Structures are given as C-alpha cells and as structure tokens.
Amino acid sequence: MNAPQAPVLVADIGGTNARFALANPTLTSAPLLNDSLREFAVIEFPSLSEAAQHYLHHIGIHTTKGVFAIAGHVDGDEARITNHPWVITRTRTATMLGFDTLHLINDFVAQAMAISVLGPQDVIQIGSAKWEQVPLSAATRNYGIIGPGTGLGVGGLVIRNGRCYPLETEGGHVSFPPSTPEEIRILEILSQQFGRVSNERLISGPGLVNIHRALSEIDGIDPGPLRPQDITMRAADGDIRATRTINLFCNIFGAITGDLVLIQGAWDGVFLTGGLVPKLLNSIQHSGFRQKFEHKGRFSAIMARIPSLAVIHPHPGLLGAAAYARDTEPVPQDIKA
C-alpha cells in the first residue's frame, strides 16, 4: 500500500478575507481536514504568497500542492482579485511557497465543484422536488449553480464516469427578460441608467437597491441612498416597499434560475449559493421563487421534477477547491478499481 497522500493547501480568496484549509483530495466527502480552517484579512498581507506562508507556519504543516479559488478573473498564469489590488502570478506564488503544483481557479468554478462533495446536511430543499446526494460514479449528471452576491455568478457541473467538469460562464450578464407589466416598467427605468440591463443588475446585492429604487420611482417616492442591508432590515420591520422589493427579487431569481436549467440542460438539479442566499433564505422559501422556476410553458411538468437547493455549508469555496484537487490528482494505486 502506498504512503498516505500529503494534504493539499486550499484557499478561498476574496476582496476582504483569505480563507485557508488543508484537504485530503482522495476523500469524496468531508475532504477538509479537521481544525485546519483559518481566516485572515487580506489587508494584513502585501501578497497572497505571504498570507499562505503565514498560514502554513501557523498550522505547522508543509505541503507542496495547492488549489486557490480567486474572487476575480483568472487568465492563464495570472489572477486579479475583484475589489483588491493583489495581482497573483501562479508560477511566482508557487516558487515562493516551494510548491510543485499550484492551480488558480475562479471562485465560482470552486462553487460548482463543491456540488460533488455536498451532503444532505449542506443544503436546504426549495420546493417539493427531491434531490439525492451526487453519486460520483454516475455515468451522467448535469447540475446548474447560480449565486447572487456582489454580482451574479452562474455556472454548472457536468459529471461523466466519476469525473467532474465545471462550467465557467458569465451568465449573470445575460439580458434581463421581464415577464410582467411591473417588470417591464422596472426594465424601462433601469435602462435609463444602465442602457443594457443584465440579470446581475437585479439579482445581486446592488440589484436589490436597483429594484427598490425603480419601485420607488413608480410610486413617485424618493427613497434616498440605501444599502442592500437597509432594504432587508426594513422588510423585516414590515416596510411595504422593501417587502415588495424582496418578493420581486425572489420571483425574478426563480424565473432566471429556471431559465438556467433550460439553457444548460441541468436536469439533475440547480444549486443556489452566494452571499445573499443565506440572508434571504426564508423569503426564497416562502416567495414565488419555485412557481416562477417551474413556469416554463410546455416544459413546466419537467421543471416541476427538477430539484432546487440552497447551499448552507459555510465554506463551499474551500470544499470546491478540495474537489478540484481531487480531480487533478492521479488516483493512488491502492484505491484504483
């Protein structure tokens, strides 16, 4: 039997925080090693390599392999973090850390890969359609993933013969398709500001503000400057316009999530992730999300059978980075079939 495989350093790097953990890529569930998770403010370090070195020194373990999920554009050897000045070069970072292998992936690629290791305890079902935990041995599985946060991430995961292939897209920038007179009026108002209006202009944190502003204009009200959290707090306090905003957000979210299933052929389910989903989970569950998701004309009966699931695992980016490491590693001889 071969010696135990060395852990892989996985990271989820955002504009504010850098999260690190160690992972065993041979595990198909719970790949993150116990008590290895640490979180640091990116402002504390001049570079990603120094943050990673600090983590490895702090935890007292050396490794030579890493997968870093980056909240920003990854272009070959280089990655730029959105909302932070770090510019990450893969080869230089690997050299600084003494790594033999380092992968830089987009954070939403990591979110998609996380689907393959999520368990029933990591998701909440939205609607009545049932979901079974992803069987990696399945010959064919197609999943969608969509996540509103600062922007709107859209992607997918294709499983073929136990191998996972993430789909990296810019689906959040698809044009917004209104389906009611109210939504048409909102589109007209937002078009005056943005010209072309994408789904991200509505289904995101800033999108909440845009919807509220448009509804206020329809009502002839000046709401003043608001943040997304102001709207959710007002809705919790019973404010009528804020509540309308949340309900409309959830309805549109459901409609475009259903569109994602049709476009990608994600017949095995779609996962909701991103920073807004946990905060709006109760609203999503009790809104028209699922009705709009299923309301697809001649495909409505098929859509009713497709599960939609909110991801509640606190660190899906790290899970996904670990899953990515698994699918970039050769299968050890002692566990081959």
UniProtKB/Swiss-Prot annotation:
Q: Which GO terms describe its cellular component?
A: cytosol
Q: Which CDD domains match?
A: ASKHA_NBD_GLK (cd24008)
Location in the cell reads: Cytoplasm
In terms of domain of life, where is this protein from? Bacteria
Q: What is its EC number?
A: 2.7.1.2
Catalytic reactions on record: D-glucose + ATP = D-glucose 6-phosphate + ADP + H(+)
User: What is the protein named?
Assistant: Glucokinase
- Gene encoding this chain? glk
